Design a protein with these regions (language model features):
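Core segments of cupin and vicinal oxygen chelate
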Residues: 2, 8-49
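Vicinal oxygen chelate
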Residues: 14, 65-86
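Short polar/acidic secondary-structure junctions
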Residues: 34-35, 55-57
Length: 86
């Protein structure tokens, strides 16, 4: 059966974005290749990886990432602490 291996996301501030996903979802940092001139960090989220690249964020017509969690309340509170809602 096929499955998604990873999702790549651009981040304006890599360190802050890594801390956000660590706090919000409990992701773990995993070995990350060196991309010359581009700060990057790979994260493990269950069997799927999240690849963060520090780059400018370009507008898109549609984007979102759906994640299943065991208990939505603590995740929602963490997202509020990070001011993650538009």
């Amino acid at each position: 059966m096929a499955q998604i291996n990873h999702v790549s996301v651009n981040a304006l501030n890599l360190d802050e974005s890594v801390r956000f996903y660590e706090d919000l979802l409990g992701v773990e940092r995993i070995p990350t290749p060196n991309f010359v001139g581009i700060p990057v960090q790979w994260l493990a989220l269950g069997r799927t990886q999240l690849h963060l690249f520090e780059r400018d964020i370009q507008p898109t017509s549609h984007h979102h990432l759906g994640i299943t969690v065991d208990d939505v309340e603590p995740v929602y509170r963490a997202a509020e602490r990070w001011d993650a809602f538009d």
